[in-house]
Structure formats: C-alpha cells, structure tokens
Amino acid sequence: MVDELELAILIGLQASGKTTFCHRMLADDHLVVSKDAFRNARHPQRRQMRLVHEALAARRCVVVDNTNPSPQEWEPLIGAARVHGAVTVGYWFPPDLPAALDRNAAREGRSRVPDVGVYDTLKRLRRPRYVDGFDRLYEVRFDGKGGFRVEPMPPEGRQP
C-alpha cells in the first residue's frame, strides 16, 4: 500500500531526458509503463491503458514514460487516475530541439528516432497546465552536472 497513489506523466520531446529521469527519480517506487516496451503490440494504447488501470487498481504508483505531447495523450491517463483516486503529476521537459537532435543522433539501434519523428512531436508538443486536470506540475531541466533540476510549475496566471 502507498500513502498517496500517483500517476506520473512525462511530457517532452524524444531524447529530452525523460527515460533517464524516470529511472533515476521514479522507477524505484513507480511501475514504469512505456509504449517502447511493446512496440510490436497490435494496440499499444489499449495495452498501455490496461497496464495503468491494473497497477492503479492494485494501489501501485505508475509513471508513463512516452512523449505525451498533448491533451489527446493526457486525457485518458488523467481519467484513469481519477477513476482510481490517484493524484496526477505531470513532469514537463521544455523543448530544446538542437540538444534533443544531438542526443538522438548519438543513440543506436531502435532507440534512435528519425529526425522527422522529433519534428512531428515538436509540432504537437504543448506545455501542460493545471486546467488540463493535473494535480501537480513540475518543470524538469538538465542541471549541467549530469543530473536534473526539478521545479514546481506555478498555477496559470501566477507565472513569473
């Protein structure tokens, strides 16, 4: 059992640090669900949602490690969290296209995404907001020392 059931949604471009952040900061106490783990599945969205629902029903925290660029991807996840009484936390990785393309170019095999895929995600990428249904939002950036800087995002209307 957990004190607070949580669904974490990572939001950002490919090669923005989401998976590294996930494994360093969340994987110890969250089930990691990523469509990358079942690329050959016939219905990856359906499989992802089944895993999310099963974990939350078992009172297990979940992190969804995909690009999740827009409300179209968030809404079903936020809905699942609500059904199970979970808090929805968004981790926003602001786009840095040149750096993401450089990191992506250094990847090998199936982990490398064609550049057109990164550009397509950038076109759809939207900063998450509390009005989208998130209970908490954080902005995640590289700290320049091999780690991450995580800062709470203020509610809309109160941004510095």
Tell where the protein language model's regions lie, with residue ranges:
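Conserved substrate/cofactor phosphate-moiety recognition/catalytic segment
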Residues: 11, 16-72
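Mid-chain, well-packed structural core segment of small domains
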Residues: 70-103
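Short hydrophobic/aromatic-enriched beta-strand-loop microsegments
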Residues: 32-35, 85-87, 112
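Short active-site oxyanion
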Residues: 8, 61, 87-89
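Alpha-helical elements of Rossmann-like donor-binding domains used by nucleotide-donor carbohydrate transfer enzymes
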Residues: 50-51, 76, 120, 124
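Conserved GTP-binding G-domain of TRAFAC-class P-loop NTPases and closely related GTPase folds
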Residues: 1-11, 16, 27-28, 83, ...
